[in-house]
Amino acid sequence: MSEPYIIYNDDGWSSYMRYPAPMSPEEVVAVTVAPVAGTGVKVYQFCALGGHAVNYNSAFLPRVGEMLPAVDTLHVWRMRETLRHLESLGTNPLQIVSQTCHDNGLACQFSLRMNDRHHTYRHGDGSWYFPELLSPWLDANPHLLLEDRALDYTKDEVADYRLRQIQEVLDRYDVDGIDLDFTRFKPWFRPGEEAVGRPKMTALLRELRLLTRRHGKTLSARFEYNPQVCISSGLDVEAWLAEGLLDQVTLGGTGDHTPDAPSDWWVRRAHAADCKVFPGIEGQLHWCPGSGGGGGGLHPGDGIADGFGPPSLEYLRAVAANHYRSGADGVSLFNFTCADGPFARAAFDELAQPETLEGKDKQYVAALWPWDAQIFYEPWSSARFLEPDQFEAGWELQLADDFELQRCLRHDFSAVLTLEWKGLNRISDFEISLNGVALAWNGYEYNHYDHGCWNDIVQYSVPSFALRQGANRLALHRTAIYPGFAGRTEVRKCVLDLRFNQTITPGALN
């Protein structure tokens, strides 16, 4: 296995929309490649969103915002002005980013969202949410679109459209590879046409493989963590890997974050075909149901502790460490350029050094929501619950740390388990255990309103001897019934904060 590294995906417009316009080439460098140059990031992915209205210069695709008769949203105006200014200087973001990557020893991949739907979203009054992403090609080809105006990949003309886009990028720009983002968004075909569309999508992948090889470039793709979801949507991913169509796979979700999604299935099949795997971590975490368009407070938040914002360094370490135990070649960072708040730059080095993650503080989170839930937009039912007459429930937490090693080294560590309860009358109504060891309430409780009811955040002390590397069984035992209550008792958040004592105390009695 080669040295691990990080893939950094720039979401395509936040790097220009969030800064005063017009931006100079030097200013573009300062907010894109410069922050990650010289770190564990070795691949920079330049995202072109859905590829209908683009953020680079194209001979046949409009630039973002150029189709609007007037612009009344500042961030769209900023991007349009910056793109116009750069064009007047004879350059554009893709040219700037790719050149800067090469100047700093990074590979630059052009990443295309295969069915991005931002251009399909509407307000309640029917007006477009992102009119800056509309394109004449979409208006001229309604017969090639699904009902929501996304692409229908059963149509041969859609494959031709994508091939033309990628051919142009390979001809005009000095990129090192093409990346196909299949997490944005299924469906690819009309309902019931997956069997018809599957071979057509495979044919497109084969053509793109030949095209990139002729140019001496790599071909990679981003998929949802759950392979069965990909396969059922009409993506023959297992065959693609076996056929050697891809050099690199990154993983992610269509929802907000996937802190404990396994990557084993992908690692086994990809490595057999000499393809590398980089599980993904989202740069923006959401748990607040009412803050759909952004943070609701007056200061940046921590994605887990505050319900909205970027992940903590401890969260990043935990996710990465578990994937390295599964044999991942590194990690990928997605949408960090649009994070609502700061995140630790140290992550760009630490996450590329799996051996240094051992013995460092971590925040392990269990995903209790559906795979594709937009947590902050919609109510959702937890996957972990007890019916009114149910007395036992449980699930596993995957912990990457070698606790036996830490004990042998006489390193002190401690852990706190935080659960959010919905439908809990008293804390004593449930006994909690980890690997058969009873956990005691540590005195912390926070009652708050969420998803239509009052929920309770409760913390439990976890004895260090209860922790194991790998699977840890968390069990719930009901000790009280609620006569006349017909609702479920749900666990809606499950977070284990692991802390290592970094001090040295000379002298001991044992």
Question: Predicted segment positions?
Answer:
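Acidic-and-aromatic substrate-binding clefts and catalytic sites of carbohydrate-active enzymes
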Residues: Y16-M17, P22-E26, L49-V54, E87, ...
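Substrate-binding cleft of secreted/luminal carbohydrate-active enzymes
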Residues: V43-G51, Q248-P259, I304-D372
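Active-site-adjacent "subsite" loops/lids of carbohydrate-active enzymes
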Residues: E3-M23, L68-Q99, D103, Q109-E168, ...
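Extended extracellular/luminal ectodomain segments enriched in beta-structured repeat modules
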Residues: R407-L417
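Active-site neighborhood of glycoside hydrolase catalytic domains
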Residues: E157-K276, Y315
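Aromatic-lined carbohydrate-binding/catalytic grooves of carbohydrate-active enzymes
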Residues: V41-E87, K186-P191, Q248-L251, D260, ...
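Catalytic domains of carbohydrate-active enzymes, especially glycoside hydrolases
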Residues: E27-V54, D171-G177, L245-V249, H323-G330
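Beta-strand-rich ligand-recognition modules
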Residues: W421-P506
